[in-house]
């Protein structure tokens, strides 16, 4: 689509704009590119790039800035790989492998600290499996279900029933579930209970079905996104001048539902993935870019992490930060088992 001269000028323009945030004029571009071209020739090339939708002229300046399409071409074809600017061994110490949730929060802080933008980490997906379940009577027709996951995490849920079960019935139900279904996926347990309900006493079967339902909800509800560094965006001129957009961004980080969807989609990709402008369609914010990568435990993808910042971000650096952090988290979580 572009000849070598146009590619060099576009690359120089994007790099210059990322560096100082100012629209790039023909004289500045001539110096930045290192090409011995007249300002008139450069203006002609810039006009062609503008016609292709790769750069645009802000109303307040005669210079040009990249569009989302221009950034995409730059990221896909023009990035130069630099040496790893971070000590992997040094950063490993910042992600303590003692507790999985501590690893996740430390990783989010590290991402925001290194990028000076927002770090996000989706906590490892939990399989809907229980290791042990117990019932505790709280009051008439009101019971506490205690669910222990395979990694030792304990969840408590209160259920209300139409029947007031006795202590012996509660013990019978928990013993049956633990002896027959411990270690199985919750969905499989639900299906088996449907098939075996006739062989069980009706009241007990109903209690167990309710317990399995709340167990599934309890385990799945632990999916979460850890966000760090939101205040970093206050120092980014691309955002700080528009309080309306800033409020939308902070709502995004507080609600987290859209972040969860984006990170979930990203977990199915291999390696680093970059969303520029509104490309993700999950976070429809044109001035935002997101760099993500999945992380693993023992070779299985269990979550995603990334950096969220302005479209005008140093992509080479962000890619390295995200890629290295995903590897560190994978190592830390695999070793913490």
From Swiss-Prot:
S-S pairs: none
GO BP of this protein: negative regulation of DNA-templated transcription
Superkingdom of source: Bacteria
Entry's Gene Ontology molecular function annotations: DNA binding
Entry keyword annotation includes Repressor: yes
Annotated keywords: Repressor, Stress response, Transcription, Transcription regulation
Family recorded in the similarity comment: Belongs to the HrcA family.
Role, per record: Negative regulator of class I heat shock genes (grpE-dnaK-dnaJ and groELS operons). Prevents heat-shock induction of these operons.
Protein name as catalogued: Heat-inducible transcription repressor HrcA
Organism per entry: Polaromonas naphthalenivorans (strain CJ2)
Biological classification of the source: Bacteria, Pseudomonadati, Pseudomonadota, Betaproteobacteria, Burkholderiales
Gene that this polypeptide is encoded by: hrcA
């Amino acid at each position: 689509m572009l000849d070598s001269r146009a590619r060099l000028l576009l690359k120089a323009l994007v790099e210059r704009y990322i560096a100082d945030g100012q629209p790039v004029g023909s004289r500045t571009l001539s110096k930045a590119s290192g090409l011995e071209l007249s300002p008139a020739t450069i203006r002609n090339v810039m006009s062609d790039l503008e016609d292709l939708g790769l750069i645009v002229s802000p109303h307040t300046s005669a210079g040009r800035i990249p569009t989302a399409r221009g950034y995409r071409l730059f990221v896909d074809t023009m990035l130069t790989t630099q040496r790893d600017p971070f000590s992997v061994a040094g950063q490993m110490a910042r992600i303590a492998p003692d507790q999985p949730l501590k690893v996740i929060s430390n990783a989010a802080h590290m991402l925001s600290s290194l990028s000076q933008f927002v770090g996000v980490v989706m906590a490892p997906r939990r399989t809907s499996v229980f290791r042990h379940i117990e019932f505790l009577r709280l009051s008439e027709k009101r019971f506490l279900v205690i669910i222990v996951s395979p990694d030792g995490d304990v969840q408590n849920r209160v259920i209300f029933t139409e029947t007031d079960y006795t202590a012996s019935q509660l013990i019978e139900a928990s013993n049956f579930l633990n002896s027959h279904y411990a270690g199985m996926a919750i969905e499989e347990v639900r299906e088996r209970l449907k098939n075996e309900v006739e062989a069980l006493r009706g009241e007990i079967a109903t209690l167990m079905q309710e317990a399995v339902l709340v167990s599934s909800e309890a385990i799945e509800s632990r999916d979460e996104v850890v966000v760090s560094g939101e205040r970093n965006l206050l120092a980014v001129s691309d955002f700080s001048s528009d309080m309306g957009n800033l409020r939308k961004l902070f709502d995004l980080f507080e609600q987290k539902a859209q972040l969860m969807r984006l990170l979930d989609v990203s977990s199915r990709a291999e390696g680093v993935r970059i969303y520029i402008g509104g490309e993700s369609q999950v976070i429809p914010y044109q001035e935002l870019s997101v760099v993500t990568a999945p992380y693993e435990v023992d070779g299985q993808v269990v979550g995603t992490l990334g950096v969220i910042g302005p479209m005008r971000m140093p992509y080479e650096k962000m890619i390295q930060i995200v890629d290295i952090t995903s590897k560190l988290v994978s190592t830390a979580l695999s070793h913490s088992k």
